[in-house]
Regions:
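Divalent metal-coordination and catalytic microenvironments
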Residues: 10, 35, 46, 67, ...
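Histidine-rich, glycine-flanked metal-binding segment
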Residues: 1-40
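Histidine/acidic residue-rich metal-binding segments in metalloenzymes
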Residues: 121-279
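Active-site mouth loops of central-metabolism enzymes
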Residues: 45-58, 81, 107-120, 139, ...
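Short, acidic/polar
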Residues: 56-64, 116-126, 202
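Metal-associated gating/positioning segment near the N- to mid-region
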Residues: 34-98
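Alpha-helix-loop-beta-strand connector modules within alpha/beta enzyme cores
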Residues: 88-109, 153-167
Length: 279
């Protein structure tokens, strides 16, 4: 498929048959996009911005510049800041900074529980009115089943979106890589795939009773995928997978490649292929 695209001030004004070739000013810059792809602005649903508290890592300005360079025009920010995003004043701060410093769309989330402690549920209704689009404890998982059931009930009543990082803390404690041959070879604590599966299975079981809006932020294993396949006809939910787990496996960690100690960890090649097939 070929054709012309007219871009003015960063926006597509005309495309394909709507472009009149005779009316294109001679001063216009032409870019050959042969063998290239054009997408609408991409959305990143799991972004950790450094404001407030970790500006030395990243701020809204550097975040938006990096996002635009990769074709991302909208991001969903996680609440794992310092202080955390768990009250109205912090939401107001985040929205103001995003509006003043960012060149992209910022969609903030707030914590599921106060101060990310996993105990006391946050004020979903109040924070939604302030513009929060969903609730998550980010890189932390709600470990207490009773707390999670209360969260789901409230989320159903208020039509709130719940985003869960699926990982059993006790099973993953001190883990750095996938539990397997590579972990043994490197002498590192491993994170078993069933640490993820257990939380996925628990939450999807709860979801059968509460049927709230629920999203698993990232899965990494074939075992979790099997649970999802069994549940998808009974409950309504979505799930994500990291590009890391689609393009890399545990063998890529190698010696001293600490930047590949990820959460969730890189799994086996069989896991990677299963995730690709699942998509």
């Amino acid at each position: 498929m070929g054709g012309l695209i007219i871009n003015e001030n960063g926006k597509i004004e005309a495309i394909g048959k709507k472009v009149n070739k005779n009316n294109i000013p001679s001063r216009e810059k032409f870019i050959d996009l042969k063998e290239k792809y054009i997408f609408p602005g991409l959305i990143d649903m799991r972004v950790f911005v450094g404001e407030p508290g970790f500006e030395y890592k990243e701020n809204f300005k550097t975040l938006s510049n990096a996002a635009l360079a990769g074709g991302v025009t909208s991001v969903v920010t996680m609440p794992n800041t310092s202080p955390v995003i768990d009250n109205v004043s912090m939401v107001d701060f985040l929205k103001r900074r995003g509006r003043d410093k960012s060149k992209i769309n910022i969609y903030p989330t707030a914590t599921l529980t106060k101060n990310l402690e996993g105990n006391n549920m946050n004020e979903f209704g109040l924070l939604q009115k302030k513009g929060i689009i969903g609730f998550t404890d980010g890189i932390k998982t709600i470990q207490n089943t009773r707390v999670m059931s209360r969260i789901m009930k409230s989320a159903y009543d208020l039509n709130s979106l719940i985003i869960q990082h699926a990982e059993d803390f006790e099973l993953a404690k001190n883990g750095q890589v996938n539990d397997g041959i590579i972990a043994t070879k490197l002498g590192l604590h491993g994170i078993p795939d069933y640490a993820e599966k257990i939380i996925v299975e628990r939450d999807l079981s709860l979801l059968q009773d509460y049927n709230c809006r629920y999203h698993i932020s990232q899965i990494s294993s074939a075992k979790s995928l099997e649970v999802i396949k069994r549940s998808k006809d009974n409950v309504n939910f979505t799930t994500g997978v990291s590009i890391n787990n689609l393009s890399l496996n545990e063998n890529d960690i190698g010696d001293f490649r600490t930047f590949l100690k990820l959460s969730p960890p890189l799994r086996t090649e069989d896991d990677r292929l299963s995730l690709i097939k699942g998509i």
